[in-house]
């Protein structure tokens, strides 16, 4: 059953939760559980109960990518943090999920109806939701998570990372963002971000508003100590 501190408009089917717009939801929505949203919490001590992990649906060229993904899943589970991810059985996404589950942690998947119909939904998750579209999938993951970590991945991973980074920049959310720089994967990406700073398209403070570490445990520690700073977007 979902955390009562969360608010969600879906309906549970076994361990699955279908979002509005899904055909099953229209049938059983009248019988759905409802919860109230927690009104406030102490921001002085950042409590991270859940972390959305963005990463590749492939394993990548280096075994280090999978090793670091496995370490992250275990560390999040041992810290009592629920892993929020894309809900599939593919690539680094599955590596993180399986490692967290093996360590006794909770894993909450959010997949799309298209991927679910292709048989790509992970069958062993604590909970998995079916979103009608990719956009709603991302929105739901952002809603569920208290923090975000990006691992090596493709354009989908970069898109998810940039969306939450931009939302923090505009103060639409106050949730820390981290990069697990496995095997130096994000080195060229960070050089490009530095180029944005050098060419006066990005304030330097925003460049340093994300946490970057090559070690999963150190990255999680950084996220816990993160403090949001309001910086004007325009130079």
Predicted segments with their positions:
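A cross-family phosphate/adenosyl-ligand binding-site feature
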Residues: 39-144, 182-217, 222, 226-235
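Short, Lys/Arg-enriched N-terminal segments with co-localized hydrophobic residues
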Residues: 26-42
């Amino acid at each position: 059953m979902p955390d009562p501190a969360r608010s969600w408009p879906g309906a549970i089917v076994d361990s699955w939760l279908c979002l509005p717009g899904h055909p099953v939801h229209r049938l059983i929505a009248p019988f759905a559980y409802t919860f109230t949203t927690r009104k406030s919490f102490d921001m002085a001590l950042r409590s991270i109960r859940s972390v959305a992990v963005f990463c590749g649906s492939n394993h990548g060229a280096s075994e280090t990518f999978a090793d670091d993904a496995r370490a992250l899943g275990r560390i999040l589970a041992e810290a009592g943090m629920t892993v929020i991810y894309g809900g599939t059985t593919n690539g680094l996404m599955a590596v993180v999920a399986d490692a967290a589950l093996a360590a006794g942690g909770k894993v909450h998947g959010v997949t799309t109806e298209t991927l679910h119909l292709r048989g790509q939904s992970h069958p062993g998750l604590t909970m998995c939701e079916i979103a009608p579209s990719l956009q709603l999938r991302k929105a739901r993951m952002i809603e569920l998570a208290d923090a975000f970590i990006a691992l090596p991945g493709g354009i989908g991973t970069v898109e998810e990372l940039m969306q939450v980074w931009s939302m923090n920049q505009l103060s639409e959310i106050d949730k820390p963002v981290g990069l697990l720089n496995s095997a130096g994967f994000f080195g060229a990406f960070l050089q490009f971000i530095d180029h944005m700073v050098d060419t006066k398209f990005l304030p330097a403070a925003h460049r340093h508003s994300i946490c970057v570490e090559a070690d999963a445990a150190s990255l999680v520690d950084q996220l816990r100590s993160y403090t949001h700073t309001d910086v004007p977007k325009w130079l």
